[in-house]
Amino acid sequence: MADKPDMAEIEKFDKSKLKKTETQEKNPLPSKETIEQEKQAGES
């Protein structure tokens, strides 16, 4: 592996080969309601 990227390689890269993907949240943060429910469940 070279330390510097190969500019010729970058320039000939074809962006059209990339396909658009839908971004999916792998680990969505819980809502405030969910957190409150879990707190209450833990206390009882």
UniProtKB/Swiss-Prot annotation:
Keywords: Acetylation, Actin-binding, Cytoplasm, Cytoskeleton, Isopeptide bond, Phosphoprotein, Ubl conjugation. Residues 1-25, 33-44 have a biased composition (Basic and acidic residues). It is found in: Cytoplasm, Cytoskeleton. Originally found in thymus but it is widely distributed in many tissues. The modification Phosphoserine is found at residue 31. GO terms for molecular function: actin monomer binding. The keyword Transmembrane does not apply. The modification Phosphothreonine is found at residues 23, 34. GO terms for cellular component: cytoplasm; cytoskeleton. GO terms for biological process: actin filament organization; regulation of cell migration. InterPro entries: Beta-thymosin, Beta-thymosin_sf. The modification N-acetylalanine is found at residue 2. The modification N6-acetyllysine is found at residues 4, 12, 26, 32, 39. Pfam families: Thymosin. Plays an important role in the organization of the cytoskeleton. Binds to and sequesters actin monomers (G actin) and therefore inhibits actin polymerization. Belongs to the thymosin beta family. This is Thymosin beta-4. It comes from Oryctolagus cuniculus (Rabbit).
